[in-house]
């Protein structure tokens, strides 16, 4: 028997098919609450190895991910699903397309500024004190 732990605040259901299972069909976490938890540079954990790798490949640190999260809007929700961290812990996550934040970035290789779209998947921990990011990469 496989033992796993649900670490997210949402836990009305549990994953049964090894992850990727869709949940609810509406956001589980309020964007204003996510922003409040991460305000001031606190309350964020890059929860998976993939997320740490995503941030590193973007040349981002903790504060850059928080800045992206602080720019999220309610209308950017895509879906909700179960995700694991590869160490028997599961989180019910909301996926958001952070394109409406209108992040314009300078791309030195082409000497041009462009609007860049990002995808972020996140959850709030059981205590309601931490936003855990599962994915954070360009769309």
Regions found by a protein language model. Give the residues of each.
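N-terminal targeting/trafficking signals and adjacent low-complexity tails
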Residues: 2-41
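Intrinsically disordered, low-complexity segments enriched in small/polar residues
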Residues: 3, 8, 75, 97-100, ...
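Short, well-ordered helical secondary-structure segments
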Residues: 21, 47, 86, 107-109
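Generic secondary-structure microfeatures
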Residues: 73, 103, 124-126
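Short beta-strand segments that buttress and anchor functional surface loops
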Residues: 98-111
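Enriched for short, Lys/Arg-rich terminal
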Residues: 110-139
């Amino acid at each position: 028997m496989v033992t796993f732990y649900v670490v997210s605040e949402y836990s009305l259901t549990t994953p049964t098919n090894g992850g990727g299972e869709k949940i609810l069909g509406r956001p589980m976490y309020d964007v204003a609450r996510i922003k409040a938890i991460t305000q001031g540079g606190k309350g964020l954990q890059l929860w998976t190895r993939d997320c740490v790798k995503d941030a590193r490949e973007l040349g981002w640190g903790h504060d850059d991910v928080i800045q992206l999260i602080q720019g999220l809007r309610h209308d950017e929700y895509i879906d909700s699903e179960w995700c694991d961290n590869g160490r028997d812990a599961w989180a019910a996550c909301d996926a958001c397309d952070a394109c409406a934040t209108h992040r314009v970035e300078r791309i030195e290789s082409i000497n041009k500024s462009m609007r860049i779209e990002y995808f972020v998947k996140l959850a709030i921990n059981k205590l309601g004190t931490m936003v855990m990011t599962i994915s954070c990469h360009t769309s």
